[in-house]
Amino acid sequence: MKILLFFILFYLFSFSISYDEVIPLGYESHNDSLVIRYREIENYYTNISFLWKGKSRYDMSFNCVLNNTIRTCTLPVKESDHAQMYSEEISACTENNGTFKMCGYDLPLFYFPSPLLISEFKPKTRGGNTTLSGYYLELKERIYVQFENSYRKDQFFYSGYVYLIPGVFQSKTPDRINLILKVYPGCGYRTIIWENHETLNFTYQEPNIEKIDINQSFLDITGTNFYNQSIFVSVKIDNNIIDPNDIISVDFEIIKLKFNYSDPFSSKFNVQVGCCDYWSSQFQITYPPIPSIVNSIPKLKGGLLIINGNRLTSSPSSSNNNNISVTVGDSICSIVSSSSNEIKCNLQPLSNSTFNNSSPIAVSINDVVNTNTLLLIYDTPYITTFSQVNDEIHIIGGCFGNINSTQIHINDKQVFGQIKSINNDETDLILKIQNQIYNFNISIESNSIKSNGINVDVEMYARINEIPLVSNKLINFTLFYVNSSNINLIPTIKIINEKSNQTSKSISTNVNESVVSCSFLIENNCGIINYEIEIGNQIYQSSFSYESPLINKCNLNSNEIVTCIGKGFVNKYNETSIFISGQSIALSKEINNSIYESISFQMNDEYNILGELYLNVCGLLSNKVNINTFPIFKNVSIPNLFDTNGGNIIIIGKYLNNNTNFTIECNGEQIIEKECKLNNSSTSLECYIKLNGPNGKTCKLLFNNDNNIVSTFSFIYKSPSINQTSIINLKQGGILTIIGNDFYYPIDKVTIIGNGNGSGNSSLNCNEAKYINDTMITCFIQATNYTFNNIKNGEMIFINVSTNGKSGISKVFKYLTQSDDVHQYSDARNIFQNLLLSILIIIIISLFISNI
């Protein structure tokens, strides 16, 4: 019975509670208000009280407004209210549609709006106390704050969907706006779930790289907001995520990983750290060039710098693989070449005002600059190597100074007069070998600084006594620095040639201390000969040259054979090449000449006989000469009839030129006046001969060198031609002027012909014919009543001129009689006067030209 009564009472209590339950539709949090919305039929809060048991109480009231079916209740919040809105418990009163329901029970935060944050909540990945700034953060004492688990493998999140952080804020300060929340370590994106099931999304602070130390094949990345669980940590190098197995250790401030960079190129990389997929900014690391050694150069001359070291160039795959620069102090060194371990560049001379004797070197490759210090120290002599050329030692190095001030030390003792030359760059010093010194240590002192020393072992060398002629078989050598153990042995020479190898012993040997004179018999040879002389255990290899071919002259004979006279020729056609104007001429047979002083070949039309000729004998070139040619005459061509004063002839032949010496005789008389010019290379001469007509002539062409007749030819002159005449009335008579060409002296006869052939009574003589010049004659027409049958007054009729057996006829004479109109006759007279004036002008011009 008691149990039944208990259940009845419990049911009634529960019903009363559920009946008074408040179920909001939504919330809004503002700086100056809290807003809660309800359905019209639901219970709603009218006021709330913040209670401290036995201490204090702070009451606040809602203003509720019904709008259709939604009731909105607003709790005004003044600035002074924020500090009071915090208690051990919250009491509330409720109504339903204006009817009081109840007051006094503890109100859970489940029914209240979420806190309003006024600044971003962004804890460090290490966690710890973090300021949470906002309003309504702690209306009542919290036990915990719920965090949603987005990263199942995070060791701080256990295995559930949420994890709990002890919720007592770390500060009891009356500042209710900035409260301290203890946060566990984490990274990336996280969510806080408030008591009303609304959420706050936030992220931990992004990782930040402060520095990266390169320690051989490891990288030590130092920064903030890394994470100490490697499963959530990634590293990118140039946007490529490295193998997780290369990450050695992780912590909140440092990450250590493997990165073995072994390329011989200078490079730079961008590094990023990611925690929970949130990435840091890029941080650049560089593997800079490492210049370690540099040669010295003269400060006032400049010179070639050779910088040795590591990573002295960029990767071939780099888009800027030519962006390399070297700066010495404030001066730019011009790049000559670069490789992974060497840079060569030219440095200009420094002014004498530069007092420092050293300058720092900066090598930049794609904007990556060396971090080590390398100084260029000026004017410090150094030796890198040497070579022996017969009795000279060529020392290679730098800063050798000049021949007047530089000192030579041999075996630490200064010697004098040994320097032969120092080049202008001070990089090559030549000195004579001291007699009888086989090995020594040499150093150079310049600018009061002594160079390093280098050991020199003098080797045997040979010198040919004279340049051998191609006909010589006996070759004489002198051997120097022969060891005492070999001094009495017989030297042997070996000729090293592609076509013939021969070995012979000296047939004559003379010894003077360490010098051996010897003679060898060698088969006839030519060109440059490589040889090896051996005496005992000493061997010397070198080469000598036979005399170069020398041409004195080359002549071309009448059979078109060129013969060159000189010396140094050989009697093997395959060892000799002939060139004319750079064109090679192949020899067709052996040169049968035992004295090596002449060579002949047949001249062909395709060779440029006017070009320079030279020989290539076994690779040695002769001097260049011009061929002495003699003209070859074939025939004479007459292209046109001769005019009054002469005409052109064309002489056909070969090897002709403007100065070809020949004579022309016509009818036993030598032609003095002739003008010739070369046509068509050297195969024809066109000559203008001044010889008056009219009779044709037979001529001879004679070659002046031997006065032989080389051709006979004939030519004829043109007949006279008539162009126009003056106008004369036959019944009055008068002087008739005839204009034309190719008139000859004397004039035989001038006839006016009616029918053109002079038959019957249709012709009239013009008497007293006179030769004026080759273009004009005159004659006199006696006044006559003669008429021409069938010829109308004013018509043109024929006129014929005969001179020295040649005649010309033309229809140019105008037939006029006395019955002609006076005006017509006057016009004719005017025309004739104009004609005479023209003739006079022509005569004056001709006289003027002839006097020039």
From Swiss-Prot:
The keyword Amino-acid biosynthesis does not apply. Glycans are attached at residues 31, 47, 67, 97, 129, 201, 215, 228, 260, 323, 352, 356, 404, 441, 476, 483, 501, 512, 574, 592, 635, 658, 661, 679-680, 723, 757, 761, 773, 785, 800. One of its GO terms (cellular component) is external side of plasma membrane. One of its GO terms (biological process) is aggregation involved in sorocarp development. The keyword Cytoplasm does not apply. Residues 1-18 form the signal peptide. Residues 290-367 form the IPT/TIG domain. Its main location: membrane. Residues 19-830 are extracellular. Residues 852 are cytoplasmic. Keywords: Glycoprotein, Membrane, Signal, Transmembrane, Transmembrane helix. It is found in: Membrane. Pfam families: Ig_TgrO1, TIG. Gene3D superfamilies: Immunoglobulins. The chain crosses the membrane at residues 831-851. It is a single-pass type I membrane protein. SUPFAM superfamilies: E set domains. This is Tiger protein I3.
